[in-house]
Amino acid sequence: MDNLNLISNFAEFKELKNIDKSTMIGVLEDVFRHALQKQYETDENFDVIINPEKGDLEIWRNRTVVEDGAVENPNTQIAVSEVKAIDPTYEIGDEYADEIKLASFGRRAVLSLRQNLASRILDLEKASLYEKYSEKVGEIVTGEVYQVWKKEVLILDDEGNELILPKTEQIPNDYYRKGDTIKAIVKRVEMNNNQPRIILSRTANQFLERLFEQEVPEIFDGLITIKKIVRIPGERAKVAVESYDERIDPVGACVGMKGSRIYSIVKELRNENIDVVNYTANPSLMIQRA
């Protein structure tokens, strides 16, 4: 690839968030083929070769060798005398390939190509991020506090993606400073002005449920089920559990030896008072237990 600094280093594509290499190569080829169509009215007789490992890109034009004076389309045909001046072994009817340098496109076309490539990469990153976190809705994620505002906290995940924890989704006793590690559940993913907005929550009942799944193997394995959660975030919560194995005490398993399992959950929720009770389908009995 010539020194137009169109793509300074293909290795940088490996650092692009949320985009796999094969997708990136497809976008690159598509952008360059679009430029070829504008420049030559077709890209059918061109080969675009992208090698991200070596960090280069080549464009080759394939033309048919024809008799002198028989060239009707200089983009798809080349006179035999012209090609023999380069390589005497070529004959009429052969296919001749010559490399196309980006400089031949012209400065304006190269600038347009740069802009198109940057726009496509940005759109691809946004779409990939939206899809990635849409699949994570209901899951716990961990990130680092980057900025604390009055109405929300800006969090960065391990890839530098921006996540939002609104004030309304924070536990009343939550207090954060830049650099703090934060754990929350992905509540929803929105698309505002073509920009993904990933909303987290620490007040959702599902956050408490996922914390129990992390701390109690029997819940994670499906031996114990959380049937219902009633919660005032940061103050208290009632968690009704049921065991599918008569040998397992669901309440005891959730609390752990001397409260070892539930302690980390209480700590994560700013000392929220959590009561774990046995579930029953009898409403009046359930009220008594609660």
Give residue spans per PLM region.
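RNA-contacting regions in translation and RNA-metabolism proteins
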Residues: 1-290
